[in-house]
């Protein structure tokens, strides 16, 4: 399953999504969801996570400093097209 995380750590619904994710699920941090990687990296530790690069950079963070895989918007569309199920 593809799980889109749009809001930051203050959102209980997004926390539930991350806690419910299985090792097979692909999590994509979009918009303010990128703050999980910065403020609460332990919440995504051991999970298959990617960050939307333009969203990271729009919030003033460097792509070079990021240790997680990055995708652009075209890559996000590809993930959506390839996924049989998604949660957003």
Where are these regions (language model features)?
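C-terminal structural segments of small proteins and small subunits
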Residues: 61-88
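Short, glycine-rich nucleotide/cofactor-binding loops
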Residues: 2-14
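Short internal beta-strands
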Residues: 26-32, 48-55
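Short, hinge-like loop/turn segments at secondary-structure boundaries
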Residues: 44-47, 67-69
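Short, charged/polar "capping" segments at the starts of alpha-helices
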Residues: 12-13, 34-39, 57-61
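Absolute protein N-terminus
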Residues: 1-2, 88
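Short, conserved loop/helix-junction motifs that constitute active-site signature segments
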Residues: 19-23, 39-46
């Amino acid at each position: 399953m593809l799980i889109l995380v749009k809001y930051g750590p203050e959102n209980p619904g997004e926390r539930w999504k991350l806690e419910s994710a299985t090792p097979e699920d692909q999590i994509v941090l979009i918009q303010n969801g990128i703050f999980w990687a910065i403020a609460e990296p332990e919440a995504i530790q051991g999970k298959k996570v990617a960050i939307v690069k333009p969203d990271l950079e729009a919030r003033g963070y460097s792509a070079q400093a990021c240790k997680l895989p990055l995708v652009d918007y075209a890559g996000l569309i590809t993930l959506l097209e390839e996924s049989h199920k998604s949660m957003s």
